Amino acid sequence: MKHVFPTYKRFPIDLVNGTGTVVTDKNGKTYLDFTSGIAVCNLGHCPANVAEAVQQQLTNIWHTSNLYECALQDSVAELIADGKDRLVFFCNSGTEANEAALKLARKYTGKEKIITFEKSFHGRTFGSMSATAQAKIHQGFGGLVPGFTYVPYNDIEAFRAEIDEHTAAVMLEVIQGEGGVIPANAAFLLEVQLLCKKMGVLLIIDEVQTGLGRTGTLYGFEQIGLEPDIFTLAKGLGNGLPIGAMVGKANLSSAFGPGSHGSTFGGNKLALAAAKEILRTMKQAGFLEEVNAKADYFRYLLEVHLEALDNVSVIRGGGFLIGIELENTAEPVVTELRDKGLLILTAGANVLRILPPLTVSYAEIDQAIYLLKSVLENQLIGSEEG
């Protein structure tokens, strides 16, 4: 790719077709895609109902800007609000959604300090990069946006020592995806929420990777009983079309009036047509119950077949966001699996990250388990011989 900046270390395959969980490269080789485009294609590749909704919108109107009223925006926002007193700001990506959340928090509170957590990932624009507590993400870009403070994840005493009257907001993920697929302890999250309420600090939850059914509920925070002041969405909201959303309690609206923030393409009608059908699908009776049943089945098989292997340290995560921490580096496993027709990711040097579409079949889960076990066993034999 000689005309594209090398900002990604790309896998040496060019995927040109996809249906459901199966993708095909330009040479005709097929793969089971257990990456979902990094937790994006939650309904699988090219779901027919979403394609039909987008196709219908293509023949009507594509883009008008946010200078005009838009019934489609309002209907999608209502679906996102999910019966709660929430308002939505539409944008194009997760990092934009997080930028909007950070701006809203500072403007509403009039304070600057924002607490985030070590190994977090919130994006790569300057505000969201500054919120990301990973030195490797910051390297080479000079001074960060001031006002961000990082504390250890799952350490309530460290958090208690840091939150104060100068704090505008706390931003966190209920499962740190890029940071190694590390779940937060429920007790930790509930105590964070309690302290935020006590101190008048806004709680922001980054649901870019964990939201839209990925962890078994529409939003990951619902499983713990959290009520964030603000949360952010992207990835699965468009199933491959670029869309993000910052969702806040309605009482925050006074800080985000005309001219306070904006996005030229945010709320684009093509992306919204997809989002509306995706949300409608996920809210259908039995959909998330089936996702949870398949996720439980997958986790059970992972534990039965992989947990006892000497090169597997721990299996963690939630729903269809799974991390397998290895004793050795993860990249050789990912490479061998790709050669054998299974696509997965890493999350750090020694963690496999597995993100199948929510629509994956039981047979596809069985095949993935077979490949994972055979490759990990083969890697173990190779390391012993080496």
Curated annotation (Swiss-Prot):
Binding site for pyridoxal 5'-phosphate: G94, T95, F121, D206, E207, V208, Q209, T264
Transmembrane segments: none
Root EC class: transferase
Compartment list: Cytoplasm
InterPro entries per the UniProt record, alphabetical: AcOrn/SuccOrn_fam, Aminotrans_3, Aminotrans_3_PPA_site, Class-III_PLP-dep_AT, PyrdxlP-dep_Trfase, PyrdxlP-dep_Trfase_major, PyrdxlP-dep_Trfase_small
Reaction it catalyzes: N(2)-acetyl-L-ornithine + 2-oxoglutarate = N-acetyl-L-glutamate 5-semialdehyde + L-glutamate
Assigned EC number: 2.6.1.11
GO molecular function: identical protein binding; N2-acetyl-L-ornithine:2-oxoglutarate 5-aminotransferase activity; pyridoxal phosphate binding
Entries under PANTHER family matching the protein: ACETYLORNITHINE AMINOTRANSFERASE, MITOCHONDRIAL (PTHR11986:SF79), AMINOTRANSFERASE CLASS III (PTHR11986)
Name of the gene: argD
Misc. comment: May also have succinyldiaminopimelate aminotransferase activity, thus carrying out the corresponding step in lysine biosynthesis.
Binding site residues for N(2)-acetyl-L-ornithine: R124, S263
Pfam family for this entry, one: Aminotran_3
Family membership noted in the UniProt record: Belongs to the class-III pyridoxal-phosphate-dependent aminotransferase family. ArgD subfamily.
Cofactor entry: pyridoxal 5'-phosphate
Pathway: Amino-acid biosynthesis; L-arginine biosynthesis; N(2)-acetyl-L-ornithine from L-glutamate: step 4/4
Main location: cytoplasm
Assembly and oligomerization: Homodimer.
Bound cofactor: record note: Binds 1 pyridoxal phosphate per subunit.
Protein species of origin: Listeria monocytogenes serotype 4b (strain F2365)
Modification type N6-(pyridoxal phosphate)lysine: residues: K235
Gene Ontology BP, a term: L-arginine biosynthetic process
Any Gene Ontology CC annotation: cytoplasm
Keywords: Amino-acid biosynthesis, Aminotransferase, Arginine biosynthesis, Cytoplasm, Pyridoxal phosphate, Transferase
Protein name: Acetylornithine aminotransferase
